[in-house]
Amino acid sequence: MEKHDIKYFENKKQCQFQEWYEKFKSVTFSSIVIPLPKIFIDYLQSDQFTTPHEGFPEFKVDEHDDLFDDNNWSTSKNHISTLDPKYYQGYSDEEDESSDDDDSNDNDKDKKPKRIVNETEFKELSNQIIKSIEKLGGNIFPKLNWSSPKDASWMNVYNSLKCTNTTDIYLLLKSSDFINHDLMQFSINQDDKDDSLTPYVLVLRKWQNLQPSMEFRCFVKDNQLLGISQRDISTYFKFLKDKKQKIQDAIVKFYNESICGKFSNNSFTFDCYVTKDEQVWLIDFNPIHPSTEALLFVWDELIPELIEQDQDEKENEETKQAKEELPIEPLTKLEFRIIDDESGIKPNLAMTSRLPLDLLQSSGGTGQGNINDILLNFKNQNLN
């Protein structure tokens, strides 16, 4: 591992939820951290998913949290209230696994445990999760050390991260590419006992009815708040223009009073949520690194000297385009960016997890581009 990779991983470890939660407990949502045994990690990394039929509710009605019911700030959503069986499938070794992408998945399969783990084998953990859900009011959303399975939310009966039982949680965790990435951060000794604890934790956070329009990412360099970006850059929220200054003032006050000088690093990013009465809540911390989305900024203007990349590393297309259009000047004072009109909307990269693998590969791995070009490319590949 190279020197800058080691530095990044050390910074990333400081952003693990269990590393900062106790210090910032008063300004974030109530949560319970559960250490995970090796057998559960094996379960998440295996391709097997089975659950008793009674684990799936036949009907659910979404309930809003009174404290964070900010629906009047955004367009109402259509909530899924009935179970669609096609989203819940059991897989076994007897199924036909032949497909065009077999070769591309061979290496991934080799890394995964070959054993099949049944949920009854970690019943004690499941009981602990059930009790924790009850303590948090019956509705939670899950995450691991760093990531939440937001890319798999469409698999959930609520079409969100809201979970009410272990089946909801296990389905989201096993369906998420983000969670799979978390599981590659630490090496687990396969010779360890099943009940031995791993570096991984399951975080259960009290469910809040948050509106994506009021989530923001903040960028800090040497304890100076340099940038604030709209978190959901795939949507234009017209009302944000009128609220922009009040939102900025609220975030700056929150940072100065609750975050500045208290995190374990001087340069980092943090996500926060602003309620309709300008109360700010901390959501998460992330390290300064190209793997952390800069959203409406580019890293060269935020913290260029801290972004260590190999010369041969492929540049992000947006970064290359920005460099060609005009020189990038590093920011010296706070800048708050939102999408000012519909022309500023950017692709939601998390949505690529919902695309068919063949289509994703045909679009260069991003799912972006002119759909006619993608389909033509896909057709030509099949003809060859």
UniProtKB/Swiss-Prot annotation:
Q: Does the keyword Nucleotidyltransferase apply?
A: no
Amino-acid positions noted as binding ATP in the UniProt annotation, renumbered to this chain: K143, W146, S148, K150, R205, K206, W207, E215, R217, R231, D271, D284, N286
According to its UniProt entry, the protein's GO biological process terms are: eukaryotic translation initiation factor 2 complex assembly
Picking any one GO molecular function of the record gives: ATP binding
> Which portions of the sequence form the region Disordered?
90-115
Output a single Gene Ontology CC term carried by this record: cytoplasm
Chain sites annotated for binding Mg(2+) = D284, N286
Where it sits in the cell: the answer is: Cytoplasm
Principal place of residence: cytoplasm
Q: Which UniProt keywords apply?
A: ATP-binding, Chaperone, Cytoplasm, Magnesium, Metal-binding, Nucleotide-binding
* Record bears the keyword Protein transport: no
Compositional bias of kind Basic and acidic residues: 106-115
Q: Which residues form a coiled coil?
A: none
Acidic residues: compositionally biased ranges: 92-105
Described by its record, this protein's role is as follows:
ATP-dependent protein-folding chaperone for the eIF2 complex. Binds to the gamma subunit of the eIF2 complex which allows the subunit to assemble with the alpha and beta subunits.
Which family does the UniProt entry place this protein in? Answer: Belongs to the CDC123 family.
What is the protein's name according to its record?
Answer: Translation initiation factor eIF2 assembly protein
Task: Please give the organism.
Answer: Dictyostelium discoideum (Social amoeba)
